[in-house]
């Protein structure tokens, strides 16, 4: 395929702007769970569709929430 034939990917909608969320708080576990996988890892920006600045704030909030035991740390999962 030539470069001209490639289609541009559709830009993802920002879930934070859609929900009109301006403040990302580490105590808002319901919001933060949308941005972590079932294994407890922080989802990539290309998956969630948030901006660079929002991704940094989300990452910091998730780390703070893990520190105070509101969210689990990413682990291999036993069993």
From Swiss-Prot:
Full protein name: Small ribosomal subunit protein bS18
Family under the similarity heading: Belongs to the bacterial ribosomal protein bS18 family.
SUPFAM superfamilies documented for this protein: Ribosomal protein S18
NCBIfam families (UniProt xref): S18
Record function comment: Binds as a heterodimer with protein bS6 to the central domain of the 16S rRNA, where it helps stabilize the platform of the 30S subunit.
Subunit structure: Part of the 30S ribosomal subunit. Forms a tight heterodimer with protein bS6.
Gene Ontology biological-process entries: translation
Native source organism of the sequence: Micrococcus luteus (strain ATCC 4698 / DSM 20030 / JCM 1464 / CCM 169 / CCUG 5858 / IAM 1056 / NBRC 3333 / NCIMB 9278 / NCTC 2665 / VKM Ac-2230) (Micrococcus lysodeikticus)
GO cellular component, as recorded: cytosolic small ribosomal subunit
GO molecular function: small ribosomal subunit rRNA binding; structural constituent of ribosome
